[in-house]
């Protein structure tokens, strides 16, 4: 160690070299910061609040990487000075003793009784024998003077620093690619959604038509002999996920069941189910892109699996593969069980088969648990990719972490297979089936309506806290007192009560609920400017109006033909005399 050449300090380094390094680092950092800012501005412009929040989580993750980098830089000197006995340091190595001896310059393998005493001394020669890296700190090994080994060397800390950064970057990129590919497959749903607004769809889905449940398109797909046995049900659903995992009949049937369970009668032709799914998926993407403490703990456990002799390449890559197959099968089973529940209520159905959503179809009664499993799969697969990239960069293609070609082939092939399954099979299936829970998600409202609701809710809670009455505070307090057909949820109300004794808050709560509101088309902001100029005049004339205006559902207009064709639900007419936001 006496012949070891110490590295230069900044006192011995040219100032122009230091300036060039600082300039390059600052330039790269500024470009990345501006790029992230531009992406965030584009998300705001396109009203992609969920994706903007996901971007904020990515920025928080990068900030966490900065803190880890700072701690590693500051603490590597202190950690490398922690000395442990050689017999403890000789356990759980990625390389075998013979491979370490060959790789680090020892021609013959030491005897078994001398192996523990000599093995760690070989590692002390790494920096002088391998020219591809320089030591991260200057000086010498203080632990060698004591006959011990450093807990983690300074150069080992530097390599760990690089791995954590690669892991975070690979995870974010992997999630973005998976989300983009999944949305690409879901584009075909737009055509199915538009079909529900056509006259042909109303003819083919006559609500007065009686059929056997097995004779419907949904019944022929799910109600068969194999669905009677749990074993055959899981076997068929396992293979079904690989071939047309989401079909048109499944989409339309689950869409109809969601609308009937959560929305107002007659909303079938107006509600855009595909946009609701898209908003929900964007909301879930915020969770997927984040690396929470549980996921970080799993990453630490994965690092322990690289010990020589565990052969982690034979089982670790298959964990995400098996989990994603089980999740895909479970989602298919849920769709089939929804169909079986229809048959349990009777062999004959009227109109479109009506599925009834419920949390009991999901594991532990929690639809969000499936999202956690998908998150775990994405991270595990990203971990495999990041570790392969990092180990190849640091030690070459053939190293102690993947010694054989079989290891490399398994890691790459399984990783690509999981990527395809998660993007094109499981993610679209998850986005559709998880809407079959007992509760609908807040994303059922568009961005502006959700903002108005939150603002009103905050104001109402504030008034209650101060003991005020909420009579003067409603979501319409800055809106027209009598909203028009296009800006109010009135036209979705059915069988409105004829009593005027209802309070302002009660009438609003019932009319503004998702079941009784035009949540997807009502835009309070678009009506605000008009309301400012006409609000006072309209209030003075409101009590003197004698004519009645009738509001009817106009979303589906069928042409006259031989015989009257009824839509799925009838909307009763409502008079302004019978409904009012005032007492």
Curated annotation (Swiss-Prot):
GO biological process: defense response to fungus
Pfam families: Mlo
InterPro entries, alphabetized: Mlo
Region Disordered, annotated ranges: 461-583
Intervals, Cytoplasmic compartment: 37-61, 183-284, 336-368, 433-583
Residue numbers spanned by region Calmodulin-binding: 447-468
Cellular compartment(s): Membrane
Residue ranges with Low complexity bias: 470-484
Main location: membrane
Transmembrane segments: 16-36, 62-82, 162-182, 285-305, 315-335, 369-389, 412-432
Entry superkingdom: Eukaryota
Keyword Nucleotide-binding attached: no
Biased composition (Basic and acidic residues): 541-551
Keywords of this entry: Calmodulin-binding, Membrane, Pathogenesis-related protein, Plant defense, Transmembrane, Transmembrane helix
Residue ranges annotated as Extracellular topological domain: 1-15, 83-161, 306-314, 390-411
Membrane association type: Multi-pass membrane protein
GO annotation, cellular component aspect: plasma membrane
Family: Belongs to the MLO family.
Entry remark concerning the domains of this protein: The C-terminus contains a calmodulin-binding domain, which binds calmodulin in a calcium-dependent fashion.
Protein name, UniProt field: MLO-like protein 6
Encoding gene (name): MLO6
